[in-house]
Amino acid sequence: MIRVHVFYEDIELGTTVRVGSYRVDTDDIVSYARRWDPLPVHIDEQAAKQTMFGGLTASGSHTLAIRTLLLHRVPIQDGVIAAGGWDEVRFHKPVRPGDELWLEVTWVAKRPSASKPDRGVVTALMKLLNQDGDVVLSHRDVIIMRLRKGN
């Protein structure tokens, strides 16, 4: 595998990267929810049919975890120091068994750190999309990134 090293200076505003995919199945939804979010809509197919969703849906935290898994396929890991936070988190549509999810990352802002000269702060608009192109999750992700050595 070729290793790509991406640092703060390499981030070009307006660039969009699309990575995926992740197929969600019933066992995935139920096993995650049994441990972390045991609501009937996530763990009981019969009870879920009686809800406004009409069937099983993935937990919001599960959806965010899938986003995180897909984000690790964007070659920025060598440059990442830490997460700075998530803003404007929105769940637009439910994630259901059989959905195939993709992550779209668009770099929307960057600035040098005011207090640490070896790093910068990058903001990305994250969109998790299903197989129909529908956005199921969106948010802004603030990422603290290393500058290349010697800068």
Predicted regions: what they are:
Residues M1-G84, G150-N151:
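Hot-dog-fold acyl-thioester-processing enzymes
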Residues I2-L13, F91-E100, E104-N151:
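HotDog/MaoC-like acyl-thioester-processing domains
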Residues M52-S59, L71, R90-G98, L129:
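Short amphipathic alpha-helical patches
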